[in-house]
Amino acid sequence: MDFRRINALPPYVLATIDGLKLEARRSGVDVIDLGFGNPDLPPSDLAVDKLCDAVRNPRNHRYSSSRGIPKLRLAITDLYRRRFGVELDPETQACTTIGAKEGFSHLMWVLLGPGDAAMVPSPSYPIHIWGPLFAGAEIRHVRLGPEQDFFDNLLESWEDSWPRPKVIVLSFPHNPTTACVDLAFMQRIIDFAREHDVFLVHDFAYADLGFDGYDPPSILQVPGADEVAVELYTLTKSFSMAGWRVGFLLGNAEVVAALAKLKSYLDYGTFQPIQIAATVAMNETPDFPLEVNAVYKRRRDALIGGLARAGWEVEAPQGTMFVWAPIPEPYEELGSLEFAKLLVREARVAASPGVGFGPGGEGFVRFALVENEQRIGQATLNLKRALTKLG
């Protein structure tokens, strides 16, 4: 059979490193995996207990609502009021998604079609590129990186784009670059969207992972933002529920309703016991994200300190669960994919090559803070030995 849409997909670069890691492990080599951003921290005991209780109730095994149960939508809007001072209507401005990734993908089907264009940061989380492409739209890349003014780059890309993009995709704190913005930036981008009649989609996956006094702003904190924007929030990192697949689309009521309508044709939502437990987690353990944040900060400090002792100076990120590291000068010519392969072979450490996040990621590797401090310390010792040996 001819799977034209599937056959058009390029090789998934990040899978190359995963394959090397698995091959090494089959040979008995202990590879420390800092490549895949797969949170290792468990959710709260209360959430797990509530899930177990809900699973035992026969009524909870029927189809759920694709929009999400009312109490869960109320819980997320209550969280936004407490956390960000944002008032949202749980009936019209909130829709539950099966994780932010599913929500974003289907949202692109709602907002874009053939002949449309979306502006996306480069580098970017892969679905931010492939979501618009799957919807039939074209991509306009906007350079994002150290010593880059993203807003100036966006203006330049806008002027060079015709037809004008219909959607701008944002995600701060940013994966993979860890770039952060303040509320003043959000105000500027909202003003731009109003002036140029473009719609904003903000993937707020790392809403609760800010360090050293930095508090990531919600785009919906800007007055009137819901006229031109929606935001995706997820429990994956904040509440350590990666495999539970609980996310939300929030903001513009017309767009939220459109996504809910599309989802009614595609799914029946997340398993209801998971929705019930997620509701309890947000309502009864509101400080849990602070505990998660503290763990990731300690891991960040351990990795940054260990890399420095290895002679690899990397700026400490203010947000996310990642470290975006420039390739050391002696290895720059290798490129990020070959350098990441070298780290697996010589240091027994897996990192994601920057090119896997688009051409704008070349010259960097991304480390995920998904191992405990002891394992991270061992990883940096391995890196130091390998880089010293290779000279």
Listing of model-derived features with the role each one plays in the protein:
Residues 2-99, 106, 282-284, 389-391:
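N-terminal small-domain helix-loop-helix segment of the aminotransferase-like
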Residues 24-27, 135, 195-196, 310, ...:
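Helix C-cap/helix->beta junction micro-motif
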Residues 78, 82, 86, 332-335, ...:
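PLP-dependent enzyme catalytic core of the Aspartate aminotransferase-like
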Residues 110-132:
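Conserved PLP-anchoring active-site segment centered on the Schiff-base-forming lysine
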Residues 140, 144-213:
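Active-site phosphate-binding strand-loop segment of PLP-dependent enzymes
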Residues 221-222, 226-297, 301-310, 386-388:
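Conserved core segment of the aminotransferase class I/II
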Residues 279, 296-304, 314-327, 361:
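Conserved glycine-rich beta-strand-loop-beta hairpin in the small C-terminal domain of fold type I
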